[in-house]
Design a protein with these regions (language model features):
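Conserved functional micro-motifs across diverse proteins
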Residues: 23-225
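Bacterial N-terminal signal peptides that target proteins for export
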Residues: 1-11
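C-terminal motif of bacterial Sec signal peptides marking the signal peptidase cleavage site
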Residues: 18-21
Length: 225
């Protein structure tokens, strides 16, 4: 088989670079408000993509971490309720109960569904006390929260593929929660600052997974408010 000619290699690299540039376009800004939305089941896919982010850390040893994180905001949860109620044929009463539970959950904590894969399976241990990973949530002011819980979730494959399709046969799924600080807790404007950053840090580096509001003040302006 003939080797690829130099011009072919250059063209291939150019195409790869162009594709990479397109795939790394900035995600759309989101709406952190509690606006009520009339989502249909067919809206779920686009809403899911809007609230899901992807980040990857690569070193000489391979992929240190690759993660797909979905922030379970009230906007996302409304689309989830619509899709879940449609799939499982919920009554109006059961749907209303589910919607209220989702609203209460969104007000109690910042919750993320995260699918993670690593080159070496033993690195994928975010939930362990001995894990080298430090997981934190930051906002536009630089305020930081530690997680209330990090749990490995083993969901039925048909369910997870339908509701969190970023999963693959190589990923491990986590539910990561950060409780909203009470009135006497540390100041954390959170989504009100216009930005949330889910950070995964280890000795080899870190990834920041970011959600920005459609319009928000700068970090300096937020800190001065």
């Amino acid at each position: 088989m003939r080797s690829l000619q130099p011009c072919g290699r250059v063209l291939g690299l150019a195409c790869a670079a162009a594709w990479a540039g397109c795939s790394m376009s900035a995600p759309k800004p989101v709406d952190f408000s509690e606006v009520t939305r009339d989502y249909r089941p067919t809206d779920y896919s686009s809403v899911y993509e809007n609230w899901t982010r992807h980040a990857k850390l690569v070193r000489d040893v391979g992929t240190v971490i690759e993660a797909w994180a979905t922030y379970k905001s009230w906007g996302f949860r409304q689309a989830y309720v619509s899709q879940y109620a449609s799939i499982y044929g919920l009554s109006d009463s059961d749907r209303a109960t589910l919607a209220q539970a989702q609203l209460d959950a969104s007000r109690a904590s910042y919750d993320f569904h995260v699918a993670v894969q690593t080159t070496t399976d033993r690195w994928n241990d975010l939930d362990r006390k001995s894990s080298p990973w430090r997981v934190t949530l930051l906002d536009a002011t630089g305020a930081e929260l530690g997680p209330t819980s990090i749990q490995v979730v083993k969901l039925p494959e048909l369910y997870e593929t339908s509701f969190f399709p970023s999963r693959t046969e190589f990923t491990r799924s986590y539910e990561i929660s950060f409780a909203h600080p009470g009135s006497g807790g540390q100041p954390f404007p959170g989504s009100a600052s216009g930005r949330l950053i889910l950070r995964f840090a280890c000795p080899m580096g870190q990834i920041d997974i970011v959600w920005d509001a459609k319009s928000h003040p700068t970090a300096r302006e937020s800190a001065q408010e």
